[in-house]
Amino acid sequence: MAELPIAPVDRLIRKAGAERVSEDAAKVLAEYLEEYAIELSKKAVDFARHAGRKTVKAEDIKLAIKA
């Protein structure tokens, strides 16, 4: 089960053009987004550690997105 709140995910889907969004659809997207964010965060942590830092910075996230 995703830790992300469903309401913001619902709003994202509506922002993409949906008139109505089922709760299941929002939950599935929330789960996917959470998995993606965790994988991206792991890469960012690796970049921070490689730079000799314990703190993950925006630049680490940007590098992880490009990697």
From Swiss-Prot:
Binds and compacts DNA (about 120 base pairs per nucleosome, corresponding to four histone dimers) to form nucleosome-like structures. HTkA/HpkA has lower DNA affinity than HTkB/HpkB and compacts DNA less well. Required for transformation, participates in both transcription activation and repression in vivo. This is Archaeal histone HTkA. InterPro entries: Archaeal_histone_HMF, CBFA_NFYB_domain, Histone-fold, HmfB-like. One of its GO terms (molecular function) is protein heterodimerization activity. GO terms for cellular component: chromosome; cytoplasm. Induction: After 17 hours growth at 85 degrees Celsius HTkB/HpkB is expressed about twice as abundantly as HTkA/HpkA (at protein level). The keyword DNA-binding applies. Homodimer or heterodimer. Dimers then assemble into higher oligomers, with the DNA wrapped around the protein core. Higher order oligomerization of these structures can give rise to long, superhelical fibers in vitro. GO terms for biological process: chromosome condensation; establishment of competence for transformation. Residues 20-22, 54-57 are annotated as: Interaction with DNA. In a chromatin histone fraction 12% of the protein is this histone. Cells have about 2.5 x 10(6) histone proteins per cell, enough to coat all DNA with a ratio of >1 histone dimer for 30 bp of DNA, cells are polyploid with 7-19 genomes per cell. Disruption phenotype: Cells can no longer be transformed, grow like wild-type, some differences in transcription occur; double histone deletions (htkA and htkB) cannot be made. It comes from the Archaea. SUPFAM superfamilies: Histone-fold (SSF47113). Coiled coil: none annotated. Changing G17 to D/L/S: Expected to impair oligomerization. Alters compaction of DNA on nucleosome-like structures. Delays adaptation to a sulfur-free medium due to impaired transcriptional activation of genes required for growth on a sulfur-free medium. Belongs to the archaeal histone HMF family. CDD domains: HFD_archaea_histone-like. It is found in: Cytoplasm; Chromosome. It comes from Thermococcus kodakarensis (strain ATCC BAA-918 / JCM 12380 / KOD1) (Pyrococcus kodakaraensis (strain KOD1)). Keywords: Chromosome, Competence, Cytoplasm, DNA condensation, DNA-binding.
